[in-house]
Amino acid sequence: MERGKMAEAESLETAAEHERILREIESTDTACIGPTLRSVYDGEEHGRFMEKLETRIRNHDREIEKMCNFHYQGFVDSITELLKVRGEAQKLKNQVTDTNRKLQHEGKELVIAMEELKQCRLQQRNISATVDKLMLCLPVLEMYSKLRDQMKTKRHYPALKTLEHLEHTYLPQVSHYRFCKVMVDNIPKLREEIKDVSMSDLKDFLESIRKHSDKIGETAMKQAQQQRNLDNIVLQQPRIGSKRKSKKDAYIIFDTEIESTSPKSEQDSGILDVEDEEDDEEVPGAQDLVDFSPVYRCLHIYSVLGARETFENYYRKQRRKQARLVLQPPSNMHETLDGYRKYFNQIVGFFVVEDHILHTTQGLVNRAYIDELWEMALSKTIAALRTHSSYCSDPNLVLDLKNLIVLFADTLQVYGFPVNQLFDMLLEIRDQYSETLLKKWAGIFRNILDSDNYSPIPVTSEEMYKKVVGQFPFQDIELEKQPFPKKFPFSEFVPKVYNQIKEFIYACLKFSEDLHLSSTEVDDMIRKSTNLLLTRTLSNSLQNVIKRKNIGLTELVQIIINTTHLEKSCKYLEEFITNITNVLPETVHTTKLYGTTTFKDARHAAEEEIYTNLNQKIDQFLQLADYDWMTGDLGNKASDYLVDLIAFLRSTFAVFTHLPGKVAQTACMSACKHLATSLMQLLLEAEVRQLTLGALQQFNLDVRECEQFARSGPVPGFQEDTLQLAFIDLRQLLDLFIQWDWSTYLADYGQPNCKYLRVNPVTALTLLEKMKDTSRKNNMFAQFRKNERDKQKLIDTVAKQLRGLISSHHS
Amino acid sequence: MAKTYDYLFKLLLIGDSGVGKTCLLFRFSEDAFNTTFISTIGIDFKIRTIELDGKKIKLQIWDTAGQERFRTITTAYYRGAMGIMLVYDITNEKSFDNIKNWIRNIEEHASSDVERMILGNKCDMNDKRQVSKERGEKLAIDYGIKFLETSAKSSANVEEAFFTLARDIMTKLNRKMNDSNSAGAGGPVKITENRSKKTSFFRCSLL
C-alpha cells in the first residue's frame, strides 16, 4: 500500500514536469531547446514522455483536420486565387528581373564607389587608431624634448620638475614601448647630471661670492657710514658743533703758519653738511651685487632629490673654508689703511652673505652655525689686528684704523653679530695709539726745539701781536701798552709747544670718538695721556736740549724764561680738556695734570746747566793760567787770563738781563765760588813744588781782581758783602802769608773771633812747605847772609808750631 | 800748574749779525754745524789747540754779537785780540758793504799791529750769491788783507782760514823775537826793558 502511494506521487510529479516541458517546447525558441530536452533525458521517464508527446501530436492533428474541414471552401477559393497569382507573379518576376538587370547594370559604378569608400573608412580607422596611440606618446616626447631644452639652457630646477613629471605621470602610460624603456633607463643619469651641474653652479656661486666679498663688504660699510652721518646730523649738539667750527676757523686764520699734524684725520672728523649728504650716490645693497638664485635653485634641486642634508653639509663646509681664507690677513696689511680696509670688507662681505642666506632660505644655515663662524672670525680678526696694529708707527694710521674698526663693528652689529670684543680690543689699540702719538710728538717737540732761535718773539704790528696772543694765553698789560716794535718775553717754541699739546689732546679725543665711553672716562684717559706727554715726552725733549753738548747760555736762559710761561699756561690746558670733553666743572677729576712739575724740572735742569756752563768757561780760562811760581819780580796788575775771565763774566751778566733775578744771583754766586775753589787748588796743587813771595804777590793781585768784581755788583739783588764771601778763604790765607802774621794766627787759633778763622792749619803748612823748600834750595848762599839764615829759622819754627796744632787737633 | 801749550793766540770774529760767525767757530772747534740760527748775545769764546812748526798753540777765539746793541761790550775785546776775522755773507750784499765799517772799528779800537783777514761765508749757497768772489778779493787787496771764501755748512776753507791767520801771527811773532834778540845782544839795558813789558809770548820764550 505504501509502495503504490509512492508510485502515485511520483507519477503526478512526473506528469506535471512533462507538461511543463511540453509547454517550454512549444514556447521556447529553437536555439534554447537543447537544455530543455537534456532535462528530459537527465531523468528516466523519456518513454512515458514520448507517449505523452505522441498523444499531444494526434490531438493537434485532429484539431488541424477539423479546422481544415471547416475552412475547405475558403481553401479552394484560395487555391484558385493562388493560380491567378501565379500568373501575375510570373509577370511580376519577369518585370523584377528586368529591373534587377537594369539596376545591376546601373549600380555597378556605385558598387565600385562603395568599395572605395569601404577602403577609405578602413584606412581612416587605422589612422585614427594610430593618432590615438600617438596622442598618448606625444606628451612623453614633448616632455622629454622640453627636458632636454631645459638642460641645455641650464634651467635645472624646471628640468628636474619636468623629469619628475615625466617619470611618474607620463611614462607609465606608455611603458610598453621600447623608446620609453630607453627613456626610463636614462632618467637616473639625467638626474645625476642635474645634480652635478647644480653642484657646479653652487661652486661657481661660492667662487662668485668669494670674489665679491670685498665689494659686498665695502657696500655694507658705506651704508653703515651713511647711517652714522645721518645720526650725527640729527644728534649734533650746538655747543660742540660751534666749538669745532671755531677751531676750524682758527686753522683758516693760521693756515700759513700752523702745519696741521693730522690733516687726514681732521678731514675725517669734519661733520658733513646736509647738502653734501644729498650729493652722495645711492649705495646699492648686497643683493644687487650678487645673484643668489643659484644657491636657491641648488637647494631646491637637492631637496627634491632627497639630498638636502648633503647639500647643507657641503655648503657649510665650503663656507667654513672660505671663512678661514677670508680671515687670513695679508702679510703687509699693517702698511696702509687700504690693507685693513680690504681685510674688513672681505669679512663683512662674507657675513652679510651668510646673513642674507639665513633669512632667505629654510635651514640651509642656522643661527648656531653662523654664531659659531662669527666666534671663530672674531677671535681670528682680533688676533690679526693685535699682531698687525703693533707694527703701526704712524698715529694717523692707527687713528684711521680705529675709525675703520668702529665702522666694521657697527656694520656687523646691524646684522646682529656681537661685537663687544672688538670694542675691548679698541681700548688696547688706544694704548698703542697713545704710545704712537707720544713717539710722534717726541719728534714734533724735537723739531720745534731744534729749530727754535731761542730769542724773544719780535712783533712789529698789532696784527702780529694778536696772532701770537691768539696762539698762546699770555696777558701782560704793560707789554700791551708798549709801542711797536716790541718783543714777547718767550721764544717761538712756547706757542708752538702749547699748540702741539692741544693738538695731542685733540688726537687723543679723536680716538675716543665712537668707542661708547662716558665723558668722564674720556676725560680721565686724555689727562693720563697728556700727563705722559708732559712728564715723559716733553720732559725728555727739554732735557735732551738742555743736556746737549755745546748748548749756549743764550739757549739756556731762554729755556728758563720759556718754561716759566709754559708752567703758567697749564691751568689753561686744564680748562681746555674740561671744555673739550664736556665734563662738568664740578666733577672731581681722578686724574690731574702734572705739567707744572715738568716745567719746574726743566727749569731747574737749565739753571744747573747754566751754572755748569759758566764753570766750564771759567775752567777754560784757568787752563790758560801761566804763573811763574819762581818769579822774584813784583807785578802791578792782574794776570791776563784772569782779566779776560773777569771781563767775560762781567759782560755775560750784563747782557743776560732777562735772566730771572734769583737764577742770575745763584749763577753769579756759583761762578765766584767755583773760581775761588779753583784758584785755591791752583795754589796748593802738588805739581807746584816751590813758590816765591813774588809769585804770591802776583796771585794776590788776581784775587783782588776777583774781589773787585764781587764788590761791583755784577748782578743786582745781593747783600752788600755776600758775593765777596766766596773769596774769603783765599783772602785770609794770602793776608796771613803776605803780612807774615803768624804770631797772631798761632796765638788766636781756635778762638771764635780770630782774624784768620778760615785758614786751615793743614793748608797753611802745605803752602809754607813750598816756601821752605825754596829757601832750602839756596842753603849754601844763605850761610853767607844772616837775613836768609834768620828767615829759614823762622820758617822752621812756624812749621813746627803748625804741626803741633795739627797734631793736637787730630787728638 | 804745568803749561800744556807753547803760545796763546787770541782771535776775534766780527761782522754783521747772521753772517755765520758762530757757525764758523763751531765748525772749527767742534767740527759740527747747526742749521738753526741762534743770535749770539754779548760775547762767547771757544778754545782749540793746534800745532804749528812743532809748537803747541792755543787758539782762544772770541765770538762777538753782531747786533748794534752789544757793540759797547764787544768792542772792549778788540784791544786784546792778536788776530781779527772780518766775516760777511756772500748772499747778503749789505753785510759785505759793512766790512768797511768793521775795518774802521778795528782801526779805532784794536792794537795797531793786529793781524786781519776777510772771510766771505756761505759760499755753498752759490745760487743765492750777491757778492762775487772777485769783489771780495778786490776789497781785501785794497786793504792789504788776506781773503778767503768759506762755508761753515760744508766746512770749505774753515780750517784753512784759522790756520792761515794763526800762521801769520806766528810769523809776526817770530819776527819780533828776532828783533828782540838782536837788540838784546847790543846791550843789557834793552833786555831789561823787554822783560818789563811782560808780554806773554816773550816771557814764554825765556822759559
Swiss-Prot record, chain A:
Biological process terms in GO annotation: exocytosis; Golgi to plasma membrane transport; intracellular protein transport; membrane fission; mitotic cytokinesis; vesicle docking involved in exocytosis; vesicle tethering involved in exocytosis
Gene3D superfamilies noted in UniProt: Dsl1p vesicle tethering complex, Tip20p subunit, domain D (1.20.58.670), Exocyst complex subunit Sec15 C-terminal domain, N-terminal subdomain (1.10.357.30)
Domain of life: Eukaryota
GO cellular component: a single term: exocyst
Span of the signal peptide: none
Coiled-coil ranges (or none): 50-119
Keyword Nuclease assigned: no
Segments for region (Disordered): 260-280
Keywords, comma-separated and alphabetical: Coiled coil, Disease variant, Dwarfism, Exocytosis, Protein transport, Transport
Keyword Protein transport part of the UniProt annotation: yes
Subunit structure: The exocyst complex is composed of SEC3, SEC5, SEC6, SEC8, SEC10, SEC15, EXO70 and EXO84.
Disease: Spondyloepimetaphyseal dysplasia with joint laxity, 3: An autosomal recessive bone disease characterized by multiple joint dislocations at birth, severe joint laxity, scoliosis, gracile metacarpals and metatarsals, delayed bone age and poorly ossified carpal and tarsal bones.
Family according to the record: Belongs to the SEC15 family.
Protein role: Component of the exocyst complex involved in the docking of exocytic vesicles with fusion sites on the plasma membrane.
Protein name per Swiss-Prot or TrEMBL: Exocyst complex component 6B
Source organism of the structure: Homo sapiens
Swiss-Prot record, chain B:
Family matches, as SMART domains: ARF, RAB, RAN, RAS, RHO
Membrane topology: Lipid-anchor
Keywords (A to Z) from UniProt: Cell membrane, Cytoplasmic vesicle, Endosome, GTP-binding, Hydrolase, Lipoprotein, Magnesium, Membrane, Metal-binding, Methylation, Nucleotide-binding, Phosphoprotein, Prenylation, Protein transport, Transport
Cofactor: Mg(2+)
Modified-residue entries (Phosphothreonine), positions: T72
Residues involved in Mg(2+) binding: T22, T40, D63
Positions of short motif Switch 1: 31-45
Any one GO biological process: protein import into peroxisome membrane
PTM statement from Swiss-Prot or TrEMBL: Phosphorylation of Thr-72 in the switch II region by LRRK2 prevents the association of RAB regulatory proteins, including CHM, CHML and RAB GDP dissociation inhibitors GDI1 and GDI2.
Signal peptide feature range: none
Localization of this protein: Cell membrane; Cytoplasmic vesicle, Phagosome; Cytoplasmic vesicle, Phagosome membrane; Endosome membrane
GO (cellular component) term, any one: endosome membrane
Reaction catalyzed: GTP + H2O = GDP + phosphate + H(+)
Gene3D superfamilies recorded: P-loop containing nucleotide triphosphate hydrolases
Function in brief: The small GTPases Rab are key regulators of intracellular membrane trafficking, from the formation of transport vesicles to their fusion with membranes. Rabs cycle between an inactive GDP-bound form and an active GTP-bound form that is able to recruit to membranes different sets of downstream effectors directly responsible for vesicle formation, movement, tethering and fusion. RAB8B may be involved in polarized vesicular trafficking and neurotransmitter release. May participate in cell junction dynamics in Sertoli cells.
Domain notes: Switch 1, switch 2 and the interswitch regions are characteristic of Rab GTPases and mediate the interactions with Rab downstream effectors. The switch regions undergo conformational changes upon nucleotide binding which drives interaction with specific sets of effector proteins, with most effectors only binding to GTP-bound Rab.
Subunit structure: Associated with actin, delta-catenin and alpha and beta tubulins. Interacts with OTOF. Interacts with PEX5R. Interacts with RAB3IP. Interacts with VIM. Interacts with CDH1. Interacts with MICALL2. Interacts with GDI1, GDI2, CHML and CHM; phosphorylation at Thr-72 disrupts these interactions. Interacts with MICAL1.
Name the UniProt record assigns to this protein: Ras-related protein Rab-8B
Organism: Homo sapiens
Lineage of the species this protein comes from: Eukaryota, Metazoa, Chordata, Craniata, Vertebrata
